[in-house]
């Protein structure tokens, strides 16, 4: 069950994030550790869960709506519906599973296919505390993330290593993207206004010349 009841809201201070990755990489453990500050080791396979938490980002309070997605292929349709509505994405693999790392590319492709523009994405490697079972090096993860312009961290849901940092960073990226959009839209409106005034002045000048002739 979800940790918080979800209420649909158009509040500008509400932000939708999506946690994606193969089954068994610890998406739910990561999310619950962030939401409730405790580690869940045994958990039923997730279908779709939505969690909520208030966070202070750049001196402003935001309500984070965090979708913990299913890893199963048969639930792609549900996942696709939610991807379209999310602002930022956390892609998760396990350092103990080479196959989960290889699957990150497919999740990236899915986001690019469903989103019409570039969105903030951070890639994280969970279970960094299980170094003896490691199949993916830190350098491999960092190189892959750099190739696709993503931030990268290794985390441990069990020991809450870098968990808060991950969610704070993706939320900050989303806030910056919102601000950039506002600035761009304002610049476009200003340019359109200047262009309109210039055309009006040009037309007035033209009419004045015509009257003189």
From Swiss-Prot:
Motif placement: Effector region: 43-51
Gene3D superfamilies with a match to the protein in the record: P-loop containing nucleotide triphosphate hydrolases (3.40.50.300)
Record lipid sites (S-geranylgeranyl cysteine): 210
Propeptide positions: 211-213
PANTHER family in the cross-refs: RAS, DI-RAS, AND RHEB FAMILY MEMBERS OF SMALL GTPASE SUPERFAMILY
Gene that specifies this protein: rasU
Family the entry assigns: Belongs to the small GTPase superfamily. Ras family.
Alphabetized UniProt keyword annotations: Cell membrane, GTP-binding, Hydrolase, Lipoprotein, Membrane, Methylation, Nucleotide-binding, Prenylation
Functional description taken from the UniProt entry: Ras proteins bind GDP/GTP and possess intrinsic GTPase activity.
Catalytic reaction annotation: GTP + H2O = GDP + phosphate + H(+)
GO biological process: signal transduction
Subcellular localization: Cell membrane
PROSITE patterns from the UniProt entry: RAS (PS51421)
Predominant location category: membrane
Entry's Gene Ontology molecular function annotations: G protein activity; GDP binding; GTP binding; GTPase activity
Cellular component aspect of the GO annotation: plasma membrane
Record flagged with keyword Cell membrane: yes
Organism of derivation: Dictyostelium discoideum
Entry EC number(s): 3.6.5.2
Protein name: Ras-like protein rasU
Membrane topology: Lipid-anchor
Record PTM Cysteine methyl ester, positions in chain: 210
Positions that bind GTP: 21-28, 68-72, 126-129
């Amino acid at each position: 069950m979800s940790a918080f009841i979800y209420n649909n809201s158009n509040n500008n201070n509400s932000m939708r994030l999506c946690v994606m990755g193969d089954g068994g990489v610890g998406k739910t453990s990561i999310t619950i550790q962030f939401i409730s500050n405790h580690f869940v080791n045994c958990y039923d396979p997730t279908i779709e869960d939505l969690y909520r938490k208030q966070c202070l980002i750049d001196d402003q309070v935001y309500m984070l709506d965090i979708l913990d997605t299913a890893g199963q292929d048969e639930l792609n349709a549900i996942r696709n519906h939610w991807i379209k509505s999310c602002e930022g994405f956390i892609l998760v693999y396990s350092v103990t599973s080479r196959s989960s790392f290889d699957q990150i590319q497919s999740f990236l492709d899915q986001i690019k296919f469903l989103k019409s523009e570039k969105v903030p994405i951070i890639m994280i490697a969970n279970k960094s505390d299980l170094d003896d079972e490691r199949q993916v090096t830190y350098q491999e993860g960092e190189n892959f993330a750099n190739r696709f312009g993503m931030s990268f961290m290794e985390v441990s849901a069990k020991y809450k290593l870098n968990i808060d940092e991950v969610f704070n960073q993706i939320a900050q990226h989303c806030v910056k993207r919102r601000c950039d959009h506002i600035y761009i839209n304002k610049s476009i409106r200003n340019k359109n206004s200047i262009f309109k005034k210039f055309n009006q002045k040009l037309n007035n000048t033209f009419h004045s010349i015509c009257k003189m002739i």
